[in-house]
Amino acid sequence: MRGFATSSFRIFVAAIGLVLLSGSAGAQPGTNFNPTHYWTYHNLEPIHFPQPIFVQDQFFRRGIPVTVDSLTRFLNWVHKNNSAVPDTFLHYTWWNIVNKVPVNKAAIVTNQFGSHIVQVLNLEFLLAPATKNQPATGFTPQANHYLCYRAVGFPSPPAAYDIQDEWRVDIQHPLDMEFLCTPCLKQHGGRVFPPVDTVTHLAVYPITPISDNFVPYVNDQFLARQLFLKQFPYEYLFVPSEKVELPTDVKRSTWGKVKGLYR
């Protein structure tokens, strides 16, 4: 019992040390970090299109079969306080995952809002790369898929932010983090889509914008069609972040393990 308590205490101290280290460094991202932010629009006519897929990420290292069943939201890139958007061609579709598989892991999430230990609870949805208002050629961007999990423990930032996409401008104050999205491998229809960036994760915060209606033509790996979009509470702001899973052996590089997963 004493040995277990000592081990648990060491893990706790290591976790706190990592948080303090990130904070002292100003929560600066790594060199391969993608700075793109996104926000969501509701799909006013959710598309029910069940598809079995196989996915693999840092939480499910052996991979698991799941089913996506409906396209419920669309992600548009945004400038947050004039943040960079390296690829304005890339958008994402939000597909609900039927299998709400539990994870129950702890992780340190770091972004420009700070660094906090969060509890990752269960699987919720998939982000698939998509284009907007492009010809229906079947081509989709070579970019990450993401598995997104319900997560708690990262508080709301203290400030509001200017947010702008090609449709509108807004000011939003994000609420407490609600989801964490991790890069994943996806297998579907006989094709394998590996992640292209295992560093950039997405921390997801509720926001409350209200917009007019928009009707873009959207194409992802599942379908191509017009979507009827509108923003109303709650929508979500996706903030690029880094993640370190806990408990971890502080003598080894977690990011090395993550990269090794996809070699």
Regions found by a protein language model. Give the residues of each.
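Bacterial N-terminal signal peptides that target proteins for export
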Residues: 1-13
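Bacterial N-terminal signal peptides
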Residues: 10-22
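Extracellular/lumenal glycan-associated surfaces
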Residues: 35-50, 89-104, 142-159, 198-214
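Short, tandemly repeated low-complexity microdomains enriched for cysteine and small residues
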Residues: 51-68, 104-120, 158-175, 213-229
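A recurrent domain-boundary module in secreted/ectodomain proteins
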Residues: 78, 125, 129-133, 228-248
